[in-house]
A protein has these predicted regions:
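A generic structural signal for ordered alpha-helices
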Residues: 1-2, 201
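Alpha-helical scaffold segments that mediate packing/assembly in large oligomeric complexes
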Residues: 3-96, 104-122, 247-248
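Sequence/fold signature of self-assembling virion shell proteins
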Residues: 56-72, 113-248
Length: 248
């Protein structure tokens, strides 16, 4: 970002700091987009990827309430993925270590399925969830924080895929038709040299550095955000990607 002295002097607010915050937010959204692309690329998972119909017998939003018809599709798919991960890690990674990451427009149709309605209706915690007595980060999207022993996280980051000056095209960073199941044991920051079963690692060289330059010769202020990192899905055995998740 760049502003002339006149614009900065006449602004009623700290215009340089405000745009530095905007640039940092864009960099954070960019990081989310890059990590999301990595975890939604089926080639990163080896043999640990399959369609919803192959795992559960139907699309994830077609589960029934009593096991008839398609049956408990979501449960069957999650259990099949969990078993594959558990076997592939020699029993090390269990469902309690796994996180299902879903986009809002994947969580919504799943939450409206008969299978999920029955699951919540028969849960002893259902009334507390409905009344709001128990905080839920997924409540807006209709899914509990834990489902069939798997934790759920809804990725609701939004980005504009068009360039500046074009008509905005807003969408979720996360895809609505895939469900990555990722291992997230232990703490956020790992220990160098120690074994890790965490699915995704972000290698950071320089993190979110905001730089400002007072360009006296051109009578302007210039700024930028430096975020130097790379991301990899390093533990494919501890991860699973369910594709073609929804019946659209």
């Amino acid at each position: 970002f760049r502003f002339g002295y006149k614009a900065v002097d006449q602004a009623d607010w700290n215009i340089v700091a405000a745009h530095a915050e905007d640039a940092a937010q864009q960099a954070m959204t960019g990081r989310t987009l890059n990590v999301t692309t990595t975890i939604e690329t089926s080639g990163n998972y080896g043999s640990n990827t399959s369609s919803a119909t192959s795992l559960g017998g139907d699309f994830l939003n077609n589960g029934t309430a009593d096991g008839s018809g398609s049956g408990y599709v979501l449960k069957k798919a999650l259990q099949a993925a969990g078993i594959a991960i558990n076997k592939g890690t020699w029993g090390t990674v269990k469902p309690k270590d796994l996180v299902c990451r879903a986009a809002p427009d994947l969580a919504d149709p799943i939450s409206r399925s008969k299978e999920i309605h029955a699951y919540l209706k028969e849960s002893p915690f259902a009334l507390a969830q409905v009344r709001g007595d128990v905080e839920s980060q997924n409540g807006l999207w209709g899914l509990p924080d834990s489902l069939y022993g798997f934790k759920w996280v809804i990725e609701d980051a939004v980005y504009n895929s068009k360039k500046k000056g074009d008509t905005a095209s807003l969408g979720y960073v996360a895809s609505s038709n895939v469900l990555p199941i990722l291992a997230r044991p232990g703490k956020l920051v790992g220990v160098v040299g120690a074994p890790s079963f965490s699915s995704v690692h972000v290698w950071v060289y320089e993190e979110m550095t905001v730089e400002n330059k007072d360009d006296v010769d051109n009578r302007r202020h210039s700024g930028r955000v430096v975020d130097d990192y790379g991301q990899d899905l390093v533990a494919s055995a501890a991860s699973y990607l369910i594709t073609l998740a929804l019946h659209t």
